[in-house]
Amino acid sequence: MAAANQANTSHASLSGETGNSASDPLPSWRAGASKQAILGFVGQVTAEGGPDTVPPEDRVAVFDNDGTLWCEKPMPIQLDFILRRLVAMAEHDPALRTRQPWQAAYTKDYGWLNGVITKHYHGDDSEVGVLASGVLTAFAGVTVEEFEIRADQFLRTTRHPTLGRSYLACGYAPMVELLGFLEANGFDNYIASGGGRDFMRPISQQMYGIPRERVIGSSVSLVWKDGTLVHKAEVDVLDDGPEKPVRIWSRVGRRPILAVGNTNGDIPMLQFTEQPDRPSLRMLVLHDDPAREFDYVTGAEQALELAGINGWTVVSIKDDWATVF
């Protein structure tokens, strides 16, 4: 049986070679180590009667969303959604304009906001509470149905500030191909994101082919009121870091054999794939393409170091993806 570290990719790939061809299941991926790792791994776990064959019910794959399935710069997409709501609140109540995070939203002080996020990636949550105070009140009292309508409309009508495309078109084409390839080979794909569960659900099927019930993410507390569920101004689950494997197990009841992330917050999820008697594939998306997307490693330093130590597959957007969107 294969060891629990990175899967052996010596098996023949499902397309025969790593190059693109008419039968290539991953045409947006350039020939190279990352593509070969994917094809070799899937061939390994699906080979009928093979020593490392994994039954379909155990072919679970988990994916982070921000920076893994869709872009997260210059700010996470959901943060843009929330900031617009904070601006509307500050316009209605001028007293909020001198308080964070309404002040940052109203004055477009994205430096402060990005600083809070960067500190979080490095384990410093000293200002997260300040940001959360606004985030949690932004949609307090809103029903789950109304929130979904607002999120869906925002994603369909709002354009990315620098890429010039709607947010709904900011999903990575190579990752969508990968999701489809895995599903065609008997995998169940799940999103396991630090982003809001109910923010992603309206578009997960259309963008990724992932049904809403397979979306695992952060959530606010809900209360039953007047025949419906209503948002409360308090955190239920922050699905990041060590909470990711907890939530995956709670929802899925199985360890994944494939995990893809892009930041330090994804490390526990990637490590959760390790099993002594089954192969696994762990991948990190490296943002190194300023011409087509963005170039940054902030918040991923530890993950990249562990990738080198443990032999995880690092996917270079610049080198491994023939197209990005």
Language-model features and meaning:
Residues 51-55:
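Short loop/turn motifs at secondary-structure junctions and domain boundaries
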